[in-house]
Amino acid sequence: MLKFLKYTVATLLCFVCIFELIVFGIITQKKNVFDSSYQNLIVDKYRILEETDDKKIIMISGSSSSFGLDQKMLEEETGYKVTNLGLHAGFGHLFHSELAKENIKEGDIVLLGYEYNWFNNFETLGQQLIMSGIDDNIDMYKHIPVNHWKDFVGYMFQYAAEKNAYVDASGIYSREAFQGEDGQMTWLRDYAMSDYFDYINDYGTISILNANDEVEITDTTAQYLSALKKYVEEREASIYFVSSPALYESVTCSIDDFLKLVELEENTIGIPYISDPRLYLFPIDLMSNALYHCNSEGEKVRTSLLIDDLRLCGAIPAEAVSQTVKDEKGETFALVDTLPKRFLHKPRTIKRVYGYNAEGREVLFTEGVDYVIDYERGTIRRTDSSSIPNYSGHRVVYHSGKFTWVNSPEFYNPDENGMFQLKVDYDYFVSEKELEALENKSAYLSENVRHKILNGEDITIALCGDSIGAGAATNGNGYFFYYLDETLEQYYNINVETLNFSMGGRSSDLLIEDLQSIIDMRPDVLMVEFGMNDHGGADGNSEERVTAYKNNIEKAVNVFQENNIDVILIGFFQQNMTWDVENMEATRLYNEVLKDIADRNKIYFADVYSVFEKVGNVKPLSRDVMADFIHHPNEWGHKLYLTSIIDVFNINGDMRPVDLPDYVYVE
């Protein structure tokens, strides 16, 4: 009997050893097989976490953070390194969460940005994705909880078959879509998720209700997250829940149910939930190819929201605010249903909320009846019974994520924004930076022009541009040339004569046509505003077209300088990227051409692109700032042009944002 037992034990030990060798061989016999795959990027993200000893933000989520987090922006605004573990939610939230434990240190911030199945999804792991993701990086298996080992052992031979049959991946769901050094998504997603309703069965829907139509967090989930909270806090780090971005059109429950989930989580688990999830319910034009995947614009908006959340809860310092108050007039919003939208500045007092009807008459709206303000978070939303136009009625017809502009009596695409946009006059406590003087860029102006302005003499400023310079889609006075005229006259107590040579639909060739006419008028300063119409189309960044644009601008600059006319070059912003003729690379390239010409000729370049980019992180430009959903700014949007131009007229060096009524301060 004893011999039999010894034999049995020896046999079992041999079997275990042989099996372990087989497992080891399966995992390590062929290295880096899945290196090109999307899921294998988890190895890079894990190594970044391992090696980052600086204070850091650890993002734990599924693919909503691989497709929706601008890590550079987050690092610059917070001062923390970012380790973004966000990848395929099919790994299981348990896996991402366990990986994060590898290197949580004092002062770190752990963010739980799980997608909306987290409340009942901490019991399973995705063996196929995890094993192919880890590949031959055996050390990562230590983060698989022991009670799940049997599942991975059982999957081993299927994994071996997949490994032998694997073909390299490419495209957006592959390693090539990401930056190796930090795991940042770099693949351009310049399209809207316009096919959602055509493929709703494939994309799915989002609801946070259980089978009984109740908001619930399972015991397993609550126990795990409570333990995770304790683990993080024992290491003197902070942990917060944050909302993931999600496609609003896919939501089948009430948006108030998301607030109930927030309350239930804080009461049950006790992790501070620092987001308003309603702000993260994005429209199709901010999403790309899945319910939780932002496009390139949505990624910026989501990151900006997250930064706001971190500031509001005190996790990172907020910008210093003074007790000085300034008015902001006419900031515009396009409001959908009862979803909130952020103000550019947190309002102190709402002065007036209004819009215009089809006849062009002003319509006033009432707080508490038509809209609700969250003064702490700085948001506005419609009420259920609001008479404010609902932007959900705005129509855009897309094809494959892009729209074609159509202007005919029978059909117009897309709808213009004017009828839907809400305008708000309010005041706010300015930041300390708004009390500081603007940078003095007046050296770009001639001594003669500076002398005239400082001595109260009349000056003449001319503008040659396209439809933006002509004030298209504005009320006639609400465009940047008018704002500049007003600002200079009020600030310096001078008379400014303006000459506008701009013409809708034209490109930089107009500048060449009007050379002599402009010279004959002898302006002191000429502002040149071209590029929006020059750069469009698939071949917009071709050498031939870029060279033609550059030659037109530079030839004109040289001629005007020879005639003692100061020149200012005005850049242009990123128009709606989902328009089928937009070329985002050309937008950046043409702005760089302008900057290069300005630098070489020692003239001022107004960086409109950067100002609009910063505002676009807070307010989706196409909805909230464009009058036509494409590229014509509304009256408030034109103030952003003034913001980019005015530094060159800060001649005495004393101009401050707080002193300029139409200047929009952008952090």
Named regions from a protein language model:
Residues 6-26:
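Hydrophobic membrane-insertion alpha-helices, especially the h-region
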Residues 228-254, 529-533, 556-591:
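Active-site segments of SGNH/GDSL-like serine hydrolases
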Residues 32-103, 109, 429-502, 514-524:
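Serine-esterase "nucleophile elbow" of acetyl-processing enzymes
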Residues 186, 190, 210-317:
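Solvent-exposed soluble domains appended to multi-pass membrane proteins
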Residues 258-312, 572-667:
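Catalytic His-Asp segment of secreted/periplasmic serine-dependent ester chemistry enzymes
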Residues 127-235, 529, 660-667:
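Secreted/periplasmic serine-hydrolase-like ester/acetyl group-modifying domain
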Residues 104-131, 182-212, 462-464, 470, ...:
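Oxyanion-hole/transition-state-stabilizing segment in secreted/luminal serine hydrolases
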Residues 318-432:
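Extended beta-strand solenoid/passenger and fiber regions
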